[in-house]
Amino acid sequence: IMPDIIAPVIPETITVHLGAPDSAAQNVVVPFVDYIKNVASSEIYPTWPENALRANIYAIISYALNRIYTEWYRSRGYDFDITNTTRYDQAFVPDRDIFENINDIVDEIFDEYVVREGSIQPLFTQFCNGTTSTCAGLSQWGTVSLAEQGLSPLEILKSFYGDDILILTDTPVPSVGESYPGEPLRPGDDSNSVKVIQTELNRI
């Protein structure tokens, strides 16, 4: 029997390890939206064209959600979702200033992420700066020239990750209060509420 596919949700928080995976570094629990704002402010420049910023922020969101959804670190026995070192993940700098335009874009699109067509799993949107380092994924500086050519955020992303990608929007953002379905769960229930709670229990 195939297990039920649990659709991703936007988590309230993300646990960030402030160092390499095996280092004795501190873990910090950060609201997911604030984490995305911090990473975007640490990884890209606020003066870039807006569509370049949006493409990069989509990649940052999708990368973080992929780490959470696949339980990349937790399935390996770690007690965190992601690290803050760019050797392994994406930059997160505690207590840094957030750029106003990045703040506003993240508030608008934090519940949107990249997938392959036919999939609901957040895409592993690897990226690098495209100057001092290159990789198979997105080139951060490369997004600038593409945005200047008039490409949309999705067109920019397709140029790096392939034409078979989509941006899923309006991803659910359940809070602890919202995960109660409004009526008691009973034996034999097979609703999405059961699946949400099963997923939460599996993560404990």
Language-model regions: role of each:
Residues I1-I204:
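Conserved, single-site charged/polar hotspot
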